[in-house]
């Protein structure tokens, strides 16, 4: 199936109709950008683990009906693979770790989707983040001690520890520094803060090297991602979460995102299972009444027993006081 409608674009475009591949290039005084898009038809041979539930193993049905059901519930896996490249110069005033650079935005994704046929475009619901390669290049001579720290974070996550996707520390004394981060997760296109999912933070430590208004370095980044109609459409290669190019091993180091330690907490199994809960996605209403819970939460009957026991103890204490007072 051809994902792309026939239309003219103002940007420089080359298209291989046989392979369903498009390349867009644009270059202005602000910088250079390039985009590569490949349709799913070119990558049918990629092996994927299928999540299926066979209706024939649940219901007894005639062979003819079985075939009709298979056809009725079949779903085409739509995947649009994208590689986006951008380059921009950074003012030394903006290289102090106080600002962030969004590496993928809703506007960019909408631009990619606009090239699809309407019947395909309206099915796209997820973006899968595969890899981000970042190259920093100095705009000054080699040999100047210029340490730099870079972090790629998911700024939607509130915890500063958990938001880290990867961090690197290097030096631009040799003119350039490069590393690659592999996020390897998918998000809904309707998530509220999509632009903050891939946020690049950079801290240039030699802040007195130049004055405000001077461009200190160039950031060039490549983002590989896929737009799909399902969260189950993509499998990722088993790369590390972050890699440092071999040539930069001696002048830099990296920090991977941490995987949490799962606690086997047998004491906290309380969950609200009351009826009349609100529908997922619907506006919630204030619920009046008692909630029913399972787990290690005291039930109403055990509470009543405890109150009865306390009352009994009070009566015994009252009788004891009467004996002491000679009443």
Swiss-Prot record:
Superkingdom, taxonomy of origin: Viruses
Record's GO cellular component terms: host cell plasmodesma
Localization of this protein: Host cell junction, Host plasmodesma
InterPro entries for the chain: Caulimoviridae_Movement, Viral_movement
Coiled coil spans: 297-327
Stated family: Belongs to the caulimoviridae movement protein family.
Subunit structure: Homotrimer, through the coiled-coil domain. Interacts with VAP. May interact (via N-terminus) with host prenylated Rab acceptor protein 1D (PRA1D).
Protein name per Swiss-Prot or TrEMBL: Movement protein
């Amino acid at each position: 199936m051809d994902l792309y409608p026939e239309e003219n674009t103002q940007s420089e475009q080359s298209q291989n109709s046989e392979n369903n591949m498009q390349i867009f290039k644009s270059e202005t005084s602000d910088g250079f950008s390039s985009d590569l898009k490949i349709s799913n038809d070119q990558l049918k041979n990629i092996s994927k683990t299928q999540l299926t539930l066979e209706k024939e193993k649940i219901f007894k049905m005639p062979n003819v009906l079985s075939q009709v059901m298979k056809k009725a519930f079949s779903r085409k896996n739509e995947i649009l693979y994208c590689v986006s490249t951008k380059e921009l110069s950074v003012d030394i005033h903006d290289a102090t770790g106080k600002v962030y650079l969004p590496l993928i935005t809703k506007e960019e994704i909408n631009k990619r989707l606009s090239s699809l046929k309407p019947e395909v475009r309206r099915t796209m619901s997820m973006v899968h983040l595969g890899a981000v390669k970042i190259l920093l290049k100095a705009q000054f001579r080699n040999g100047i001690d210029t340490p730099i720290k870079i972090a790629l974070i998911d700024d939607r996550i509130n915890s500063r520890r958990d938001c880290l996707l990867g961090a690197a520390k290097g030096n631009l004394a040799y003119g350039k520094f490069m590393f690659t981060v592999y996020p390897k997760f998918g998000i809904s296109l309707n998530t509220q803060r999509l632009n903050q999912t891939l946020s690049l933070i950079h801290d240039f430590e030699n802040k007195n090297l130049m004055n405000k208004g001077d461009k200190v370095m160039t950031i060039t980044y490549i983002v590989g991602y896929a737009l799909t109609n399902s969260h189950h459409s993509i499998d990722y290669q088993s790369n590390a979460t972050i890699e440092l190019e071999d040539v930069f091993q001696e002048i830099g180091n990296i920090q991977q995102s941490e995987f949490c330690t799962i606690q086997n907490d047998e004491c906290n199994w309380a969950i609200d299972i009351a009826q009349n809960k609100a529908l997922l996605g619907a506006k919630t209403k204030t619920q009046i009444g008692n909630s029913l819970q399972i787990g290690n939460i005291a039930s109403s009957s055990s509470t009543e027993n405890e109150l009865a026991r306390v009352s009994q103890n009070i009566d015994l204490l009252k009788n004891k006081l009467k004996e002491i007072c000679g009443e």
